[in-house]
Amino acid sequence: MSFTVAIVGRPNVGKSTLFNRLVGKKLALVDDTPGVTRDRRPGDARLMGLTFTIIDTAGLEEADEESLQGRMRAQTEAAIDEADLSLFVVDAKNGLTPVDTALAEMLRRRGKPVVLVANKSEARGSDSGFYDAYTLGLGEPTPISAEHGQGMIDLRDAIVAAIGKDRAYAKEDVAVTDVDIPPSESEADGEDEEPVYDDTKPLRVAIVGRPNAGKSTLINRFLGEDRLLTGPEAGITRDSISVEWDWRGRTIKMFDTAGMRRKARVTEKLEKLSVADALRAIRFAETVVIVFDATIPFEKQDLQIVDLVLREGRAAVLAFNKWDMIEDRQAVLADLREKTDRLLPQARGIRAVPISGQTGWGLDKLMQSIIDTDRVWNKRISTARLNRWLETQQIQHPPPAVSGRRIKLKYMTQVKARPPAFMISCTRSDALPESYTRYLINGLRADFDMPSVPIRIHFRSAENPYESKKKRT
């Protein structure tokens, strides 16, 4: 993008609504409750021929530096410093407050271009608030309605005037990127060579877990900066915030998510929106890191989150955080491994890494586990290898007999990856017990080195081409 714009203002003036309008989708949570946005959220904006990076920010308030509101303010000030231009949003419907005046003074001291935006100008009685905005000394306010999309052309013109026409419409060099070409039919059948894992493609990783497990602290440690709001208060993160960084030459896009509590405890509308946002991040990700608090691991909600991730078909890695607070580490690690195998039988072999987001201990090992797990998630196995394996499995443990006739597994092929899914042609597929499916899945994990990912097997009854002729005679 050619330039960066920060949306700033006091709480509940419509900043996130404007952000969603400019990016063309509902990325930021919107609610009547003040202070919904806490972290700074970037997005790709398009406005009447302009393309730029837009940053949604927390509502600015006067607050002590160490308080939650003070730390939110620091995040917003960092966004202002990062941006080339600020959109200072005021509420034309409800008028100015002393906080607006203080923020205008702060923006003037920064010395960067500012566009004054009078939102909610469609409301009855908004004229008074619009004209009051002139008193802020930031030039002519631009009247808009972020909710209804009114005034967007005027906003575009104000941005161009503030940043300059050359900068606003500057052309960027377009990087040549790899195109993901689907395999041909012969490649999909796997008769030729199995495809090589591409470790240069960007990787999408969601960080999930219970509230206060240390998810945001972990991402900040990866980035080497206080990019995300953290603190002792549970439930600080509300939006799913994405950040990009480079790990050993590979682009990693990480999604910080709101803490996920048991459904019965989620009563507030805003928390329900936050959890729904976290679920969307899981579905968009390729690999999901489930962060456990190592001091109180394996709460019921931890297990439910792991089960949810696997049911969504994502690759999963466990991170036992706060390892710096553990004293007898060897004994605790052995106990965690035993509980992982016992309490998560559906995730046999899942990678589990002890880490400390506070000190950075174990993060390289965690990242390598993420890469290794993604490699398995993308794995394809040739049809020839699968059918040799299937024959061996039936010799070692034959399928059960039904009405005196043994079920025969005739043919196996991989129908997709991400996650790996297989189709087996057999007789009497409806009579094959679930226990035999588990036997095959466990065999695939062990023989083809496929831990940490869900494996799906679909059975199809083999058709007898002479069956219809027999019925006619």
From Swiss-Prot:
InterPro entries reported in the protein's UniProt record: G_ENGA, GTP-bd, GTPase_Der, KH_dom-like, KH_dom-like_a/b, P-loop_NTPase, Small_GTP-bd
Gene3D superfamilies (UniProt xref): 3.30.300.20, P-loop containing nucleotide triphosphate hydrolases
Molecular function terms, GO-annotated: GTP binding
Ligand binding (GTP 2): 209-216, 256-260, 321-324
PROSITE patterns: G_ENGA (PS51712)
Keyword Cytoplasm on entry: no
One GO BP annotation of this record: ribosome biogenesis
Domain EngA-type G: 3-167, 203-378
Keywords assigned: GTP-binding, Nucleotide-binding, Repeat, Ribosome biogenesis
Database matches in Pfam families: KH_dom-like, MMR_HSR1
KH-like domain ranges (all copies): 379-463
CDD domains in the cross-refs: EngA1, EngA2
Annotated residues for binding of GTP 1: 9-16, 56-60, 119-122
Its job: GTPase that plays an essential role in the late steps of ribosome biogenesis.
Assembly with partners or alone: Associates with the 50S ribosomal subunit.
NCBIfam families on file: GTPase_EngA, small_GTP
Family: Belongs to the TRAFAC class TrmE-Era-EngA-EngB-Septin-like GTPase superfamily. EngA (Der) GTPase family.
Protein name: GTPase Der
